[in-house]
Amino acid sequence: WCTPSRNLTKAYDAEGDTERKNASVVYDECGWSYHYPSDEYAFMHKFPTNVTPVYLMRLAEIRLLHAEALANTDDPGGAADIVDEIRGRAGIGKLTAAQRASADLMREAVLHERRLELAMEGFRWFDLMRYGDDYSKLFEICDGVNIKGSASYDSYFQTRRAMNDNRVLMPVPTSVLEDNTNIEQNLGY
């Protein structure tokens, strides 16, 4: 479904990022669904029809990968220049001096920028796993997307799975373990 979470729409609002929000999120009435009955719910707008071209790779993604590499090799200034370029194209302000000077703050800024720029393009899960981030972020969609915050969610929305380190990686196949005794099974299997 790729439904935008309330947290994502708030992140756009906090940045004053109407350009990317309007390109990614739409509040449209959906009369055919029991769970999304009105225009109070956010829907993905980035690819609005089944004939919309789907980009496999965008320049912004490549630039943000470069910024991430710079941030992880202690060049926060170089990473900030790239992020500021992308933020400028979206019509929002530059990063703070503190973010530009700190490798840790720059890594957070790059991850945040990837979230806003590449929203609903299939990168978020990989970003969170790469950074070993808080797994609860994966379940923000269960928080619902009713902008008024007044909906009561039934069991359809309440289904949750326990997320922990054991569920991030799949088990190594038994045949691989038997063929190479130097390979160890992933935790939890």
Task: Outline where the language-model segments fall.
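Polar, glycine-rich mid-to-C-terminal structural blocks
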Residues: 1-3, 7-10
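Acidic/polar-rich alpha-helix caps and helix-coil junctions
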Residues: 15-189
